[in-house]
């Protein structure tokens, strides 16, 4: 009888510890990003992104963009580039994604690709100085 009781108590402890584990939530990531904890926000966005179904294209695009912004702000260019690519693949509606993608590609020395992204961005905002200077910088490199 004691063995069954011990197993039962052990089972309850394991189950309760599993329920107490905090799962990654989009709202948690947004809050971390809002207060400037970009590294933690990027990690949470990554977990949420992998748990989100590929069928939810709008949500995955949004999460990818936010994750890219966090990685850009902590100067993690490789992860930011990858996340911007995912945001573009999932048709993120804000054209700023092309400007940021151009900046990340320029930073890694991929100048022809950067110019293409700057050009796509400039279709919506032809007088943007960041894009103009980015293109000139790529051409001079």
Predicted regions and their residues:
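Start-of-helix register in tetratricopeptide repeats
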Residues: 23, 58-62, 96, 130
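Canonical tetratricopeptide repeat
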Residues: 62-66, 100, 134-137
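Register position in tetratricopeptide repeats
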Residues: 34, 73, 107-108, 137-141
């Amino acid at each position: 009888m004691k063995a069954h009781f011990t197993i039962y108590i052990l089972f309850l402890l394991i189950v309760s510890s599993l329920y107490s584990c905090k799962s990654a939530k989009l709202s948690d990531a947004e809050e971390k990003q809002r207060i400037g904890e970009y590294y933690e926000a990027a990690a949470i966005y990554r977990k949420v992104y992998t748990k989100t179904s590929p069928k939810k294209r709008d949500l995955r695009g949004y999460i990818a963009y936010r994750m890219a912004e966090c990685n850009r702000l902590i100067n993690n260019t490789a992860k930011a580039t990858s996340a911007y690519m995912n945001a573009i693949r999932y048709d993120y509606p804000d054209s700023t994604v092309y400007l940021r993608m151009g900046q990340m590609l320029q930073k890694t020395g991929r100048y022809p690709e950067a110019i293409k992204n700057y050009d796509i961005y400039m279709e919506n905002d032809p007088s943007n100085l960041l894009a103009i200077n980015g293109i000139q910088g790529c051409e001079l490199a």
